[in-house]
């Protein structure tokens, strides 16, 4: 069954067909998330989040191109939201701050 027909039927009440759509694109979306994150566990979570959003908004989807592109857009937004919400704060050093002599000794010990 073509994506357009699947989506039409899902939008008109046949929610069981969501499983077919998810199975069809799951690996592609997982690979995309893994490409963006480099983390298998996180990619799994982001893939799940992508499909949860699809389930929530499938009723508003209008067929205007490849469905896979639509899913990739959702996945990209999910990944970007994750990165925005989980920024790592980096401590900036003042121009006058330098590393301590002890830091250098610690580095030498680690290298040996």
Segments from the language model and where they lie:
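N-terminal module of bacterial RNA polymerase sigma factors
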Residues: 1-27
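Arg/Lys-rich amphipathic alpha helix in sigma70-family domain 2
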Residues: 59-62, 73-92
């Amino acid at each position: 069954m073509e994506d357009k027909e699947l989506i039409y039927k899902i939008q008109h009440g046949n929610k069981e067909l969501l499983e077919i759509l998810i199975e069809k694109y799951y690996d592609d979306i997982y690979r995309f998330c893994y490409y963006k994150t480099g983390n298998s566990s996180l990619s799994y979570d982001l893939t799940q989040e992508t499909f949860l959003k699809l389930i929530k908004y499938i009723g508003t989807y209008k067929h205007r191109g490849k469905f896979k592109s639509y899913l990739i857009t959702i996945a990209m937004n999910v990944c970007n939201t994750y990165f925005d919400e989980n920024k790592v704060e980096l401590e900036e050093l003042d121009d006058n701050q330098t590393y301590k002599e002890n830091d250098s000794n610690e580095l030498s010990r680690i290298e040996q």
